[in-house]
Amino acid sequence: MKKFLTTLALTLFFINTSQSQFNKIQTNDFDIISTSMQLDYVLGHAIRCSHNALDFHRRLFEYDPKEKIFVMFQDFGDYGNGGATSLPNNLISTCISPMNYSFESSVAGERVFSIMNHELVHIAALDNASKSDLSYQKFFGGKVKSSNDHPISMFYSYLTSPRYYSPRWLHEGIAVFVETWMDGGKGNALGNYDEMFFRTRVLENSRIY
């Protein structure tokens, strides 16, 4: 009996230890999780930045998300960055390491604020569905993610989320412009990597906004 209780106590200890590595905050619009206890300090700030950005994009893009947006904060890379997708669900992955300034221009002290502004533009641009998109999503039971094993799935995926297949330069151009605008004129639009988008718009005498 003593051996059983000792084993049970050790098991519960390790279970609690493993679960405590992750912290999660849920709101009506977001599920935000950190992958390490060392990142928990940023969650409160992250949820405020996420809601501020989403409220801004709601007004700008007339975007009304139909599902929660999952945000994961991690520190798996050497430089801060983010990624976003709308397939099959809305997901943002954010590395909160210091930014790389070799080809980019960002707000160093507020990289969480800047990254969330940028990545939520992607979510709004990718997930903002028309009536036909919503009809196909209802028909297929959600947004379809394409599979390399079944190339025809790309067609079904396009029907449910056509803006996912827009050129990357278009999505990045929108995101860096709005991000820089929201950051008060300091952002990736000033970096030489993304500046090509605006040079092209000026060269073609096209309307930027």
Predicted regions and their residues:
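Juxtacatalytic substrate-recognition/specificity segment
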Residues: 20-160
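Sec-dependent N-terminal signal peptides
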Residues: 4-16
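Post-HExxH zinc-binding segment in Zn-dependent metallohydrolases
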Residues: 53, 128, 132-208
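Residue-level marker of positions within ordered structural domains that often coincide
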Residues: 10, 18-19, 62, 180
